[in-house]
A protein has these predicted regions:
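Basic, polyanion-binding surface patches
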Residues: 1-227
Length: 227
């Protein structure tokens, strides 16, 4: 209906906000707080949250939130004039509060302990820790890149873009000696290679990729070409 939400009005007035991240334990209360209560109604009380004073800004923090960010509003960018167009609020974090219960043994935030949720469309939300998986980051290494992968691998219908990304993330292609030793010590790979069936060979390599073993996948794929 093109009305302005109280959050935006408060941002424009105070030029300060607190961003409280939402985890699964508080999602129902957060949903309740999104009710269009009249201006002036204390939504902390309505949602059953605990308001605690901030240190560097005027707005209160939500005690139940595992991470609270005190922010100064730098810019408000209108994304349109029609109903539902929205606004982009650019903020500077001036104080960060982290509940130590969400930290792992290394002092970093554990994605399982923080148990974040995200808002989707309609009534739908997503619980982050139920969809966790790891992707190795090439921060300390220099991957050879997909462009260095032979065409017979890149053009195969068996390998996905993710598979090619894994193959391209190794630092060096295995040597002939490394491949020979690998094949010699692996009877299953020997059997697949003896069939000379390219599809079966590539499927075997894909098994290694599915198990996050790109180096062995390379050895399977190149074995026949170094004999």
């Amino acid at each position: 209906d093109n009305t302005i939400k109280h959050t935006l009005i408060n941002c424009e007035k105070t030029k300060e906000v607190v961003i409280n991240v939402v985890n699964y334990d508080m999602v129902q209360q957060v949903s309740l707080s999104s009710t269009e209560y009249p201006d002036g109604v204390n939504e902390f009380l309505k949602a059953g949250f605990t308001a605690i004073a901030s240190e560097n800004v005027k707005p209160y923090r939500v005690a139940e939130s595992p991470v609270q960010m005190e922010c100064k509003v730098n810019q408000i960018i209108a994304l349109g004039t029609e109903g539902g167009a929205g606004n982009l609020i650019v903020c500077e974090i001036v104080k960060l509060h982290i509940n130590e219960d969400i930290l792992d043994e290394n002092g970093t935030i554990s994605p399982e302990k923080i148990d974040l949720v995200s808002r989707l469309g309609g009534n739908w939300y997503s619980r982050a820790k139920e969809g966790l998986f790891e992707v190795e980051k090439p921060l300390a290494t220099l991957g050879i890149g997909v462009d260095a992968i032979p065409n017979f691998i890149k053009e195969s219908a068996i390998f996905t873009g993710n598979d090619l990304g894994k193959l391209g993330n190794i630092e060096t292609i295995p040597t002939e000696e490394e491949i020979a030793i690998f094949v010699q010590n692996n009877t299953q790979v020997k059997a697949v290679l003896s069939s000379t069936d390219e599809v079966k060979i590539q499927q075997k390599a894909k098994e290694y990729l599915n198990n996050e073993d790109a180096l062995s996948a390379w050895k399977v794929l190149l074995a026949q070409r170094v004999e």
